[in-house]
Amino acid sequence: MSGSSFGKLFKITTWGESHGRGLGVVIEGCPAGLPIKESEIQLELNRRKTGQSKVTTTRKEGDQIQIMSGVFNGKTTGTPISLLVENGDADSSKYELIKHLYRPGHADYTYDIKYGFRDYRGGGRSSARETVGRVAAGAIAKKLLAREKIKIIGFTRQVGKHIAEKIDYKEIENNIVRCPDAKMAEKMINAIMRARKTGDSLGGIVEVVAQGVPVGLGEPVFDRLDADLAKAVMSIPAVKGVEIGAGFKSATMPGSECNDEFVMKNKKAATATNNAGVILGGISNGMDIIIKLVVKPTSSINKAQNTVTQKGKKAEIRVEGRHDPCVAPRAVPIAEAMVALTLIDHFYRTKFSKL
């Protein structure tokens, strides 16, 4: 099975399954001399981990990070960094009961047909638990970006029909749905709890803003920055749509309104608006990157649904495991990580673009 690596100069390879002994990531291309502690990586993992609030899965994983290689005396050595998180609260008993059924919305059927064999425990490799490694690597990417004064901010923009209108970044970590609009956060929480009570789930929209991105990140044609960002966030389980800048709204705007006119700010060229989401010709123009991603409602729900067995017989399924009623709040740090990994990779690639 290929497809577990991401990046070119700053490259990560994640490994592990939802109910295996553990998960992790190997990072290549991190420069030597970066001060890093397990506690710094742990802060990011704590934002993503299970059982953190009433709107997340009840699975209780500590997600304690262990640095296995690539760091000595508190600094990176320039060699591959290996990070490990052990699984401690996996319960495969519920999956034993439905292992011959294809769960609607999951990768059971496609994995079965493609590989002829699959790990049915919690989805195995297709589970969002795989993103532990991404978030851990993203913590290091964020620290490297911070040295260049680039900051990544993610939040929940929408849950179901409830959309954040008032954006205050200080409010993001003050509520369990990571919404920058305090009043809307309560409505989101109530909506998620109603869905959970009925055995259903909700989707949402996560927004990520990258501040301080310099002019020049991205390559022409196939390695455009917006193309790589889209691939990065689309690789997150449950993500079904991506919008950069004005995105789909651009289809309703005339060119005279959509074009970002150039002006002078602080003696430098800048754009008066940011409908392009900072990227022109696949290359960043120095404004804030704004990217939104749509996450579908959690596929595992405690409602009866029609399906078929591996032998092609009609069946009914009800998924009774421990699952998030809405993945948007925990998808925030994952989306931040993927944006950070994309930007740091392009940052290093840009260093070699001219003498």
Identify what each model region corresponds to.
Residues 1-59:
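N-terminal, positively charged regions that mediate nucleic acid binding
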Residues 21-33, 129-150, 223-231, 287-289, ...:
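Alpha-helical support elements that line or immediately flank enzyme active sites
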Residues 113-221:
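Glycine-rich, mobile lid/loop segments that gate access to catalytic sites or pores
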Residues 44-104, 108:
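Glycine-rich, N-terminal phosphate-binding loop and its surrounding beta-alpha-beta segment
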Residues 11, 290, 300-355:
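Internal helix-turn-beta structural module
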Residues 11-14, 119-130, 215-216, 274-279, ...:
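A short glycine/serine-rich beta->alpha loop
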Residues 99-124, 305-323:
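Short acidic, glycine/tyrosine-flanked loop/strand segments centered on an H-E-D-like triad
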Residues 15-21, 199-202, 206-314:
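Glycine-rich anion/phosphate-binding loop at the beta-strand->alpha-helix junction
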